[in-house]
Amino acid sequence: MESVVVKISGSLVHPPRLDYLTRLRDVLWGLVDGGFRVAVVVGGGGLARSYIDVLRRAGVSEALLDEMGIESSRLNASLLAKLLYPRSQPYPLASLREVLEVFMTGLIPVSGGFQPGQSTNAVAAVIAEALGARTLLNCLKGVEGVYSDEPSTPGARLLRRLTYRQLEDILVKVSSQRAGSYTLWDMVALSVARRSGLRIVFFDCSDPANIWGALKGEKGSIVEG
């Protein structure tokens, strides 16, 4: 059975919308029914950013802001894990070891962040590497894939296929490594993906059915090689 890791933007989970979340649940269950072994990682999204913004303006350290982001992502992950139950554990997992233990039982492991200084994108890449997954699906909200520049920049082009090096060049231009700001991908996650030869698909998951299209290479941007 092929393993696949699904990284879900926290902005897709919070604020929670029942119709969307049940459709997302059904697609994830459908992947399992279709013969895939699935692991899920959920980001902190707007929930994390709102908390982090207040704390940063209050002068709180980046290390503690990272902790706030982790806790926010785990709350989002807890929501999805409970929704996926009984085909998932009903609580967020907090380490690679816990993910592997749940995965070996045949359930869908659901996690948020693991540790300060590590984005949920990096968590997803590490999990994919550990599970031997070939593909990592990065579910975005309202963004079709990877663009040549910030999507709002005039002249920015959607790139359907690109290499790790091309993604790295784009990240240098558009990414910040501050807590709560891993909007596309980050260098730690990229280094893990590169060393393990992951195929990453960035795509708009405003419609959960797009997960199937991304898995087939019909949606979004594919990064590999």
Swiss-Prot record:
<dbReference type="GO" id="GO:0005524">
    <property type="term" value="F:ATP binding"/>
</dbReference>
<dbReference type="InterPro" id="IPR036393">
    <property type="entry name" value="AceGlu_kinase-like_sf"/>
</dbReference>
<protein>
    <recommendedName>
        <fullName>Uridylate kinase</fullName>
        <ecNumber>2.7.4.22</ecNumber>
    </recommendedName>
</protein>
<comment type="subunit">
    <text>Homohexamer.</text>
</comment>
<dbReference type="InterPro" id="IPR001048">
    <property type="entry name" value="Asp/Glu/Uridylate_kinase"/>
</dbReference>
<feature type="binding site">
    <location>
        <position position="44"/>
    </location>
    <ligand>
        <name>UMP</name>
    </ligand>
</feature>
<feature type="binding site">
    <location>
        <position position="66"/>
    </location>
    <ligand>
        <name>UMP</name>
    </ligand>
</feature>
<dbReference type="GO" id="GO:0006225">
    <property type="term" value="P:UDP biosynthetic process"/>
</dbReference>
<dbReference type="GO" id="GO:0033862">
    <property type="term" value="F:UMP kinase activity"/>
</dbReference>
<keyword id="KW-0808">Transferase</keyword>
<dbReference type="InterPro" id="IPR011818">
    <property type="entry name" value="Uridylate_kinase_arch/spir"/>
</dbReference>
<dbReference type="GO" id="GO:0044210">
    <property type="term" value="P:'de novo' CTP biosynthetic process"/>
</dbReference>
<keyword id="KW-0547">Nucleotide-binding</keyword>
<feature type="binding site">
    <location>
        <position position="45"/>
    </location>
    <ligand>
        <name>ATP</name>
    </ligand>
</feature>
<feature type="binding site">
    <location>
        <position position="147"/>
    </location>
    <ligand>
        <name>ATP</name>
    </ligand>
</feature>
<keyword id="KW-0665">Pyrimidine biosynthesis</keyword>
<keyword id="KW-0067">ATP-binding</keyword>
<feature type="binding site">
    <location>
        <begin position="7"/>
        <end position="11"/>
    </location>
    <ligand>
        <name>ATP</name>
    </ligand>
</feature>
<dbReference type="InterPro" id="IPR011817">
    <property type="entry name" value="Uridylate_kinase"/>
</dbReference>
<comment type="pathway">
    <text>Pyrimidine metabolism; CTP biosynthesis via de novo pathway; UDP from UMP (UMPK route): step 1/1.</text>
</comment>
<feature type="binding site">
    <location>
        <position position="49"/>
    </location>
    <ligand>
        <name>ATP</name>
    </ligand>
</feature>
<keyword id="KW-0418">Kinase</keyword>
<comment type="function">
    <text>Catalyzes the reversible phosphorylation of UMP to UDP.</text>
</comment>
<dbReference type="Pfam" id="PF00696">
    <property type="entry name" value="AA_kinase"/>
</dbReference>
<feature type="binding site">
    <location>
        <begin position="114"/>
        <end position="120"/>
    </location>
    <ligand>
        <name>UMP</name>
    </ligand>
</feature>
<keyword id="KW-0963">Cytoplasm</keyword>
<comment type="similarity">
    <text>Belongs to the UMP kinase family.</text>
</comment>
<dbReference type="GO" id="GO:0005737">
    <property type="term" value="C:cytoplasm"/>
</dbReference>
<feature type="binding site">
    <location>
        <position position="150"/>
    </location>
    <ligand>
        <name>ATP</name>
    </ligand>
</feature>
